[in-house]
């Protein structure tokens, strides 16, 4: 169990072997903040050491809040939760998971894409990367939040080697409901 209660604002080292990486990443008001609106400080990450027997299955739950200030750009770029063969401190590719990251060959990625990137593709995605080749397993297209708004809610991620992965979000304009 990990929470960020009790850590002072600005904390970037939790003292537990995890790595908080990125110019914007820090604890703020008892929460992990990975980026700051309007500052272009993307590609932050929080990685934890390998957990023994996690390949036998796991469940992760957390509360998430995404806020976009008014008058800047539309919300960008997104975020992902990743499980795979990457090193501590790996920053990933935001909403693209670990795609095209050197040395990352096998990965499960639970993705939330808040930016249109020049086309209508945005939404939630469950992807896998095997031997370096990424495959999208489930995708729901739609906005996550509008310019100048906030969304929040619980996220539940599970992996079972026999039945696969599931990804569920609540409180977004477009939610993941991949069972």
Model features per residue range: what roles?
Residues 1-179:
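Polar, low-complexity loop segments and adjacent catalytic/binding residues used for recognizing
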